[in-house]
Amino acid sequence: MRALWVLGLCCVLLTFGSVRADDEVDVDGTVEEDLGKSREGSRTDDEVVQREEEAIQLDGLNASQIRELREKSEKFAFQAEVNRMMKLIINSLYKNKEIFLRELISNASDALDKIRLISLTDENALSGNEELTVKIKCDKEKNLLHVTDTGVGMTREELVKNLGTIAKSGTSEFLNKMTEAQEDGQSTSELIGQFGVGFYSAFLVADKVIVTSKHNNDTQHIWESDSNEFSVIADPRGNTLGRGTTITLVLKEEASDYLELDTIKNLVKKYSQFINFPIYVWSSKTETVEEPMEEEEAAKEEKEESDDEAAVEEEEEEKKPKTKKVEKTVWDWELMNDIKPIWQRPSKEVEEDEYKAFYKSFSKESDDPMAYIHFTAEGEVTFKSILFVPTSAPRGLFDEYGSKKSDYIKLYVRRVFITDDFHDMMPKYLNFVKGVVDSDDLPLNVSRETLQQHKLLKVIRKKLVRKTLDMIKKIADDKYNDTFWKEFGTNIKLGVIEDHSNRTRLAKLLRFQSSHHPTDITSLDQYVERMKEKQDKIYFMAGSSRKEAESSPFVERLLKKGYEVIYLTEPVDEYCIQALPEFDGKRFQNVAKEGVKFDESEKTKESREAVEKEFEPLLNWMKDKALKDKIEKAVVSQRLTESPCALVASQYGWSGNMERIMKAQAYQTGKDISTNYYASQKKTFEINPRHPLIRDMLRRIKEDEDDKTVLDLAVVLFETATLRSGYLLPDTKAYGDRIERMLRLSLNIDPDAKVEDEPEEEPEETTEDTTEDTEQDEDEEMDVGTDEEEQETAKESTAEKDEL
């Protein structure tokens, strides 16, 4: 038995020695290759684990050497709180996984900034590698993604400190505060923003992360982690980087899309297009090249050339080697961020064509911008920005207005794209403005999706709005009226309603149609310049169209006296003017409401008072009897010249146009506005004392106040005035009946005369035999009937001719 044990032990030792001998491989290699990973999913089987370890190889190191390195490496276990934080980062903090690449490139840019700063005082800082670049390489075969920078690199201690510890202090306190904030439904962005953990976004897409780094003050080291623990060891290959860091991601199976070149290129252009340092992606392209032909191919081609003259020329000339065109796939580094951030340059140094080219590239538009502004803001927060007004309004500009995010302002921090998912960067009414904002002062939270200090964002917003309004104001008048106002006029009106702090600036940008010109629009400044002497109010009339507004009874006397009236023809117009208390010291007057008064002499005043006294019986009769419960009061009008009467709203009531808009909105939402305070207010009934109908009514009621015809006429006038004043009738049937009664009286027809009864036709009697015959031979019966009808018609025609 003992001999068998000894024999078995010898066999094991011989086998082990054979394996070690077979595994010895040369250590030399290049920096371009790094890790690989098996597709096996299970890690419980020893064979699977072995195959996986053999697949993961560092450049120049075989599987056994990798295992030996891992055994010798110093391992660090994440604490329980750090593990919780890691899970929080991976599972909840990031809104989309693709930002891992943005974070890695951003960190690479920071490292390059540091070494460039060091090189200003240390001339040997760049001796290991003079180029400052970021390079990205996809390895589909090994399921690897490499991000390499030639930045400052990290020492062993820095790898442990920077990559091994998420929260540099107060990890438990941070988690407790975050838990409390989540329970209270509060934002955790301010807490998260204190911890720079963008590197760990790599675990969103990777099962394992390996960092190879070389610092000028230390040897090259390898850091490795699977998000549960990490290890650090000196790189046995020596200095293969020169200086800098390579981050290698062993991608998860579901993240394989990030090995596609198009995906990586699009992400670089989306997030890191304006990084200060060049970013290269290892890309392939097909090129047509000329290669020398094989001897057999060349001989065959010469044989095919049978032209004797060509043959003679060839003998005379020096023989050239035969070549052929071949398509080859060529791999090389492709520059991704060739568009330089022109907002970082002084505006005086940027040509107009550069702004236009940048706008087209940035916005994906084919037209030039209508206007642009380039500025640097300083103060509480410093930032650079370029803003553009597009030539035409974006499609669906007012779809889901206010609830839909505006993605036309892109926020950058140190040339790194952060987000365009903002509700607060610009106010809703400026949702058409496109541009970029770049600041070095903005603090970011862990995912860079929201800002840590909202106060700074408000400062930026305030300056952006002011600069945008300055830009719009500088657009030439002809271009503004013909183009800008047609595309974005509604936005400016909404701004007057919504933006209290900039209301005065926005009011100067308003444009409306007016009685001054049949087609041109006018500004409020121009209206005020044309105001009559002693005119203290800006008159406006609202309607569904210009034709409706200018034919309204409310503008008759104003136009006759030469006053200019602004026509509000858009649904938002009346809201806009109501939000403006005044303009240039002049208050607005809705001519469809009370308060329209004219400057009058003493003689005119005496004449008006005499007319009011003359028509006092009619006014009292209308208020107390004919139109009782329908009107607030009846007065002699100062605004009517042609119409007999009009229905005027109180100063705080709804005009006809506003009531129509409110009812349309209520219909869409299913609300009932009949009980609304403004809708239920009674109106003032104004009469024109010079109109023949009104004068005749005065005569009639003096003779008989109970005259039914006059009572009907008063109600018809009221309902007609309701319609002409822009309001809707609650009972159109009753109105129609009264109109019919008035028509009967005008034609001397008895108002109570009945409509003649329509004679009823008796049904024809048919026998059963006839019915059966008809069913049996229907076609024949129809033909016979037709012939008989034609004969009868011919007889009648002959008889009529005889009579004539």
UniProtKB/Swiss-Prot annotation:
Positions of modified residues (N6-succinyllysine): 404, 633
Residues with N6-(2-hydroxyisobutyryl)lysine modification: 168
Signal peptide from the UniProt entry: 1-21
InterPro entries documented for this protein: HATPase_C_sf, Heat_shock_protein_90_CS, HSP90_C, Hsp90_fam, Hsp90_N, Ribosomal_Su5_D2-typ_SF
Modification Phosphothreonine, positions: 786
PTM-bearing positions, type Phosphoserine: 64, 172, 306, 403, 447
Glycosylated residues in this chain: 62, 107, 217, 445, 481, 502
A GO molecular function held by the record: ATP-dependent protein folding chaperone
Keyword Transcription: no
Binding site residues for ATP: 107, 149, 162, 199
Modified residues (N6-acetyllysine): 479
GO biological process: ERAD pathway
Short motif (Prevents secretion from ER): ranges: 801-804
UniProt cross-references to CDD domains, sorted A to Z: HATPase_Hsp90-like (cd16927)
Biased composition (Basic and acidic residues): 792-804
Chief subcellular location: endoplasmic reticulum
Keywords for this protein: Acetylation, ATP-binding, Calcium, Chaperone, Disulfide bond, Endoplasmic reticulum, Glycoprotein, Hydrolase, Hydroxylation, Nucleotide-binding, Phosphoprotein, Sarcoplasmic reticulum, Signal
TM region(s), chain numbering: none
Annotated region (Disordered), positions in chain: 288-323, 750-804
Enzyme class: hydrolase
Biased composition (Acidic residues): 289-317, 757-791
Family: Belongs to the heat shock protein 90 family.
Function (record text): ATP-dependent chaperone involved in the processing of proteins in the endoplasmic reticulum, regulating their transport. Together with MESD, acts as a modulator of the Wnt pathway by promoting the folding of LRP6, a coreceptor of the canonical Wnt pathway. When associated with CNPY3, required for proper folding of Toll-like receptors. Promotes folding and trafficking of TLR4 to the cell surface.
Subunit note: Homodimer; disulfide-linked. Component of an EIF2 complex at least composed of CELF1/CUGBP1, CALR, CALR3, EIF2S1, EIF2S2, HSP90B1 and HSPA5. Part of a large chaperone multiprotein complex comprising DNAJB11, HSP90B1, HSPA5, HYOU, PDIA2, PDIA4, PDIA6, PPIB, SDF2L1, UGGT1 and very small amounts of ERP29, but not, or at very low levels, CALR nor CANX. Interacts with AIMP1; regulates its retention in the endoplasmic reticulum. Hyperglycosylated form interacts with OS9; promoting its degradation by the endoplasmic reticulum associated degradation (ERAD). Interacts with CNPY3.
Protein name: Endoplasmin
Organism lineage: Eukaryota, Metazoa, Chordata, Craniata, Vertebrata
